[in-house]
């Protein structure tokens, strides 16, 4: 019976060690946020402010990479660390949704979540009954390329 208990403790410790190894380094993209739209400029591009956080001590020796859109290659992230936050700016073309993901080049399994954001036109609509879907017919996007900011809940949707 003591052997069974000892094996159970050993197995639990081993599983805990494996889980700790898998989550040793994690990143979270603070900005851009999901479904955010950034105004394009006259060159049909925008500077996108990237803000990444980590709760763990990380090497700040240039091992952070990003991938803009799934079918593109990973690139070195050039930016600045301040405490546990990384700040960078990327030049992104307008036209549709983009995704961004971050990882540690030394341990590629340690990644951030994938965030979808857009670069294009930002319009402020106020005072129109249909702008808040209060008209006779609720409005909906036909293309999926429309996002709205909910001021009450402070989020893009």
Regions found by a protein language model. Name each.
Residues 1-9:
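Sec-dependent signal peptide recognition
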Residues 9-18:
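Hydrophobic h-region of N-terminal signal peptides that target proteins for export
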Residues 21-157:
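Cell-envelope and extracellular/periplasmic
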